[in-house]
Regions:
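Short, solvent-exposed loop/beta-turn-alpha elements that line the ligand-binding surface or hinge
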Residues: 2-6, 27-59, 92-127
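Extracytoplasmic/secreted proteins, especially bacterial periplasmic and envelope-associated proteins
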Residues: 21-25, 52-60, 69-76, 80-83
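A broadly tuned preference for mixed-charge, low-complexity surface segments
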Residues: 9-25, 61-67, 116-122
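Alpha-helical interaction segments
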Residues: 19, 44-47, 64, 81-82, ...
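Pocket-flanking alpha-helical
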Residues: 1-34, 81
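Bilobed periplasmic-binding protein-like "clamshell/Venus-flytrap" ligand-binding domains
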Residues: 11-14, 64-101
Length: 127
């Protein structure tokens, strides 16, 4: 609540995407989510970051159908956030995968969501 009400100077925040697209993360930095009054709570852009340059890259990316061009624009938007030092990334999740040749039906996806009910192992030769 203190974060949403801009009553803290420093805090840790985590975000997990619910769909695999850069928009899901970069949307957090769009100035359209910054309220006019500092006392008004905001959930999405709790950083209260405003950048016309970022917004333009982001808005253009959202409107772009070409995936390569869209990713280029998202990269520029991301770099703008980095250049403006809006956040300080200090922690990244570590994800695990089962990649042994005897593992079967182990799902791999960018969202790190897995259903292991169909996973099985086949005997390895020589063991």
């Amino acid at each position: 609540e203190a974060i949403e009400a801009a009553k803290t100077d420093f805090y840790r925040l985590g975000w997990v995407a619910d769909y695999p697209d850069a928009e899901n993360f970069l949307n957090l930095f769009h100035s359209k989510y910054v309220p006019a009054e500092l006392t008004t709570k905001t959930y999405i852009n709790s950083f209260r970051y405003k950048s016309k340059i970022f917004d333009q890259y982001f808005d253009d990316a959202v409107q772009t159908v070409d995936e390569t061009k869209r990713n280029e624009l998202y990269t520029k938007a991301d770099q703008q956030v980095i250049d403006d030092a809006v956040v300080m990334p200090i922690y990244y999740d570590i994800d695990f995968r089962l990649l042994q040749p005897n593992v079967r039906n182990c799902p791999q996806n960018a969202m790190e969501q897995r259903d292991f009910t169909e996973v099985y192992f086949v005997p390895m030769k020589g063991f």
